[in-house]
Amino acid sequence: MDPLWYKDAVIYQLHVRSFFDANNDGYGDFEGLRRKLPYLEELGVNTLWLMPFFQSPLRDDGYDISDYYQILPVHGTLEDFTVDEAHGRGMKVIIELVLNHTSIDHPWFQEARKPNSPMRDWYVWSDTPEKYKGVRVIFKDFETSNWTFDPVAKAYYWHRFYWHQPDLNWDSPEVEKAIHQVMFFWADLGVDGFRLDAIPYLYEREGTSCENLPETIEAVKRLRKALEERYGPGKILLAEVNMWPEETLPYFGDGDGVHMAYNFPLMPRIFMALRREDRGPIETMLKEAEGIPETAQWALFLRNHDELTLEKVTEEEREFMYEAYAPDPKFRINLGIRRRLMPLLGGDRRRYELLTALLLTLKGTPIVYYGDEIGMGDNPFLGDRNGVRTPMQWSQDRIVAFSRAPYHALFLPPVSEGPYSYHFVNVEAQRENPHSLLSFNRRFLALRNQHAKIFGRGSLTLLPVENRRVLAYLREHEGERVLVVANLSRYTQAFDLPLEAYQGLVPVELFSQQPFPPVEGRYRLTLGPHGFALFALKPVEAVLHLPSPDWAEEPAPEEADLPRVHMPGGPEVLLVDTLVHERGREELLNALAQTLKEKSWLALKPQKVALLDALRFQKDPPLYLTLLQLENHRTLQVSLPLLWSPQRREGPGLFARTHGQPGYFYELSLDPGFYRLLLARLKEGFEGRSLRAYYRGRHPGPVPEAVDLLRPGLAAGEGVWVQLGLVQDGGLDRTERVLPRLDLPWVLRPEGGLFWERGASRRVLALTGSLPPGRPQDLFAALEVRLLESLPRLRGHAPGTPGLLPGALHETEALVRLLGVRLALLHRALGEVEGVVGGHPLLGRGLGAFLELEGEVYLVALGAEKRGTVEEDLARLAYDVERAVHLALEALEAELWAFAEEVADHLHAAFLQAYRSALPEEALEEAGWTRHMAEVAAEHLHREERPARKRIHERWQAKAGKA
């Protein structure tokens, strides 16, 4: 693990209580958070900061802790607190370490109140409230003094915050030891970091401000030392130090203090610069924040669970901020403004996007407050700061899909009135809208993650642009450069960038990957109101692969009809959610939908294709196993191997060309080489991890030199078969489960495979097994070969000639009869294994379920679990027999067409007679048989309108009409 992971992080701050209620008691809980991890993963955050969830009387939203080792029951139990699933998704977890104070209900304080208690010095006591006179009161709206008299102790106790939060006495070694033990307890449970709440106030000394004392700095260093001695590097401390930069710098030490600290003074000055339309406040604070150790990092934020603090601004600046952002006094609290981000910006989308761009590109680790990604609002009429801590707005239902508890049972009411009401602002409404705030944030976070090192670890150089309404800076890391420009004005601005030092480099816009003219000196740009732009500065030779403007691109004539897909990077930017380029993915999925409409094996012509998962199966050239959802009149999931190649290659499956990164996409379901690669990787013992699931596989058998494709999804080589579950309908899962239990010598039992695993869910993506010696064929192909040999014997004879067909079709009829016997024995075995309650278990597939090898018929696959009448299975196989007749006749002389129906009926009769003889107890219904044949014929015609399918459909529709 990279011990500097926190520099590349995107932190999502949430209150478990506010996020999602799984047990419907009105309070969010850990199970609710677990269920919403996929949403956070899709959003693109990779670190969770959980606000206090410990035992507490909740007088200060959980920051008043009464037991550090217990979880507040409304959130769940200690058993519910597990970081495993978050870690499995690549997410870190940071929790609160409230080490300055406890609740008055904490057993430590209750014991300390008693006369002569050995725990008396765990808190700060005085006989007079005059001690530490002159130390400021932080919550002036609620407290008049830092001392409160306790009648039990007959003394005053010290509290820097609320009266019910007595400060711990860090001069007591026992207190420090106890807090270390609390930290160890949660770190042992897998927590990756701790936010040190209210850290500047640990010690008190007469004649000082009792803030940022040297003793506090040393205590922080001891805390880090204890953490690293026990766990090594990798777990972090994030300090809440609401101070000026020069007061915060000592907390970093020489790299032996905290790993991160909030840049509190920068945050209000971002809002100040926006309203003043002048970059000065931002530049000033960025310069003040320089000089931290190489391993340290600033944490950046726009809003959080507290007020927008104006403690660290001048009196004039505070007056300006109140007038600009909170003219109504009800939005003011303590020395700050209690508003969420979007209302603070007056609902202005451009200003929101601009500030988000600054948050994600300035030097530091960004923190996103829950709900701000969709533009949630606030409720100033709730007490204290609760107005910005309301339930997450998941949908527009009565209580925002946060909980099914009665409305009155909710811990806080959701925002239900005005433009930020959950009726209008919710995840459900924004998730599928590519123009929503949520989609904007997902795209930007994907870009941030794609360039995590430069934004998280790179240097920042401010550019001296003459136009002060424009903020411009360069981020550089290990030879990579990104230029960020932002217009703080509500009007369009033109400006010149002093880029003389970068002459010859080409600015490439990061979102579109569109190259701009090379730098030749001062660089003229124009940005719209509150606009921003990000450019990678690259050498000319590094951008030769990038596209010319779309209107100038001329594809080769043979590629003119190929769909174009914009791919600004490797295929991961289209297939990996955290790196995704939305426009390119949409173009890729549209191209896939187009090619899948042409697949005869697919029983659905998709109007829309969605990517559910993707695993990189091979690095060079990049090959991904994808799980797709197809939509039309119904939904269907398929698994397809997709390969991207920078050069055009021989072989099937080409379906799109890429620009940005020029190359070609191939769908490999018909490529024999892919199936050999699959066997080879499984032979090694394959294990991989996508964003969604684990992929594990094995193949105990040999890997043949050559593999032949028998049909889409099924391939075989010498002694080996491999089957890919192209259609994920559960058929392979049933095959793996049931075939080993069938006591039939002609059943090919699976011996290996590839499996998709996510928690308790598991599905089979591929199966492998052994074959007897010989050259196998798909049974449909084998039947067609026999027909091509048999049908020419009918030349010169008239249809209806007695005794003609049994002699001419002897070999074909023998194969069909064998198939009838096999199906009968299979039905009997399936009934014994799966039971017959609710209908007979069916094969559920056509001839593709079987292989032919040296005249023998082998079962290799079952369809999805289905129950019904045996006539349905008989019809599926009989339809394939009849289609083989038509395809063979299409390849022969026209004069033989007169025999089409007679040959089909003869083979059907042989098939049914063989089935009846092998399973006499199963009574077949002629009417049911005819109806099922008509239904199967209609289904196949819907898949693909070819002449053979059309003729068969017309014949059976006529028969069904007569029946």
From Swiss-Prot:
MF (Gene Ontology): maltose alpha-D-glucosyltransferase activity; metal ion binding
Family annotation (Pfam families): Alpha-amylase, Malt_amylase_C
Binding positions (Ca(2+)): 100, 167, 201-202, 204
Reactions catalysed, as given in the entry: D-maltose = alpha,alpha-trehalose
Enzyme Commission number(s) of this protein: 5.4.99.16
Binding of substrate, residues: 60, 101, 165, 195, 305-306
Any one GO biological process: carbohydrate metabolic process
CDD domains: AmyAc_TreS
Active-site residues per Swiss-Prot or TrEMBL entry: 197, 240
Enzyme class: isomerase
Keyword set, alphabetical order: Calcium, Isomerase, Metal-binding
Keyword Transport in record: no
Signal peptide bounds: none
Homology family: Belongs to the glycosyl hydrolase 13 family. TreS subfamily.
Protein purpose: Catalyzes the reversible interconversion of maltose and alpha,alpha-trehalose by transglucosylation.
Cross-referenced PANTHER family: ALPHA-AMYLASE FAMILY MEMBER, MALTOSE ALPHA-D-GLUCOSYLTRANSFERASE
Protein name: Trehalose synthase
Organism expressing this protein natively: Thermus thermophilus
Native organism taxonomy: Bacteria, Thermotogati, Deinococcota, Deinococci, Thermales
Name of the coding gene: treS
